[in-house]
A protein has these predicted regions:
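Zinc-dependent deaminase catalytic domain
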Residues: 1-144
Length: 144
């Protein structure tokens, strides 16, 4: 995930991997949509980049969500997300509320993410809540 985060051009680079049985299935990083008021605005979070890559074919099929979850086997995967600071130290990368909602809906049961102390926290998504707003969400919703 660190190698992926290093590819990001954003102010807060995030990298993510989706693993299954100890094997990396797919990796990704956060990407910008455009420059808005001279700042990079995040359009695609790292965790959603990974999920989009893994799920793109199945999600286009006209199946109900339960069937898609079964085919994808995401319940057996772990989603890992990290953030790098300017000096390449780990920072807080707990998914925002929107990403957490999507992660749960797709049936991912475990998530690992970095915190501000350089640790990786592993949680069962059933008990993982997030009211965190990404910086891009704050920029578009300044009353946060």
């Amino acid at each position: 995930a660190k190698k992926q985060a290093m590819k990001s051009q954003l102010r807060f680079p995030h990298g993510a991997i989706l693993s299954k049985g100890g094997k990396i299935m797919v990796s990704g990083f956060n990407k910008s949509r455009s420059s808005f008021m001279n700042t990079n605005q995040t359009c695609l979070h790292a965790e959603m980049d990974v999920i989009n890559k893994y799920c793109s074919v199945i999600m286009k099929k006209k199946l109900n969500l339960k069937k898609k979850q079964e085919i994808l086997g995401l319940s057996k995967c772990i989603l890992w997300v990290i953030r790098l600071s300017a000096n390449n130290e780990l920072g807080s990368s707990k998914p925002c509320g929107v990403c957490m909602k999507n992660i749960k809906e797709l049936g991912i049961k475990k998530i690992g993410y970095s915190n501000d102390y350089g640790e990786i926290i592993i949680e069962n998504t059933k008990y993982c809540t997030s009211n965190h707003m990404s910086n891009a969400q704050k920029d578009y919703n300044p009353i946060y």
